Regions:
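Short beta-edge strand/loop motif at the mouth of beta-sheet-based domains
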Residues: 13-14, 33-73
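Hydrophobic pocket/interface hotspot
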Residues: 25, 29, 35, 61, ...
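Beta-strand/loop substructures that line and gate deep hydrophobic ligand-binding cavities in soluble
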Residues: 90-141
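A short, structured loop/turn motif at beta-sheet edges
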Residues: 22-23, 54-56, 81-88, 110-119
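Intrinsic-disorder/low-complexity, polar/charged segments enriched in Ser/Thr/Lys/Arg/Asp/Glu/Gln
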Residues: 9-15, 22, 48, 60, ...
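Short coil-to-beta-strand transition motifs
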Residues: 70-77, 101-104
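Hydrophobic/aromatic beta-strand elements that line small-molecule binding cavities or substrate pockets
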Residues: 16, 50-51, 76-82, 106-112
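Hydrophobic ligand-binding cavity/cleft-lining segments
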Residues: 1-46
């Protein structure tokens, strides 16, 4: 469950705390083997072989989500705009007109040390008014998966 989630002016913002240090949460966000274990909302999986992360400014952060029921595929193509390990990752998600996302989405992921763990702040924009709630739900579900991975 998110500590908090808001959507305003077509921005989605989620704050989550984890009982793991920022370095561990960072690794789970940038290591392909770990990303494949938690990326995607419920009902979607991310095959390890689809995860390509070039951890540098201008690098790629690409993967493929596969619907476990229908087999449908949703490619995620992102460019790394900013990286400062283990504190900040900024990505630009390529448009996905088939889902109603006609503009690039910029997602900012901040990792803050907090009470012996990590406070993770994720913000993304611009979302359409229709897609913002779905993005919030999807991010919440995949951060639940991340929490389970970090607790294992």
């Amino acid at each position: 469950m998110p500590d908090s989630a808001t959507q305003s002016d077509h921005q989605v913002a989620i704050v989550r705390t984890f009982d793991a240090p920022p370095e561990q949460v960072w690794e789970a966000r940038v290591d392909p083997a770990q990303v494949a274990q938690w990326w995607g909302p419920d009902g979607l999986e991310t095959p390890l072989e689809s995860v390509v992360i070039e951890l540098r400014q201008g690098g790629r952060y690409d993967l493929l989500m596969v619907d476990t029921r229908s087999g449908g595929e949703s490619p995620v193509r992102q460019k790394i705009l900013e990286v400062s390990a283990p504190e900040l990752l900024v990505l630009r998600h390529e448009p996905m007109p088939q889902y109603g996302l006609v503009d690039p989405i910029v997602t900012r992921v901040e990792f803050h040390a907090h009470d012996g763990g990590t406070r993770l702040e994720v913000t993304g924009s611009p979302y359409t008014a229709e897609l913002g709630p779905m993005a919030e739900l999807g991010w919440g579900q995949q951060l639940d998966k991340l929490g389970r991975l970090l607790s294992a």
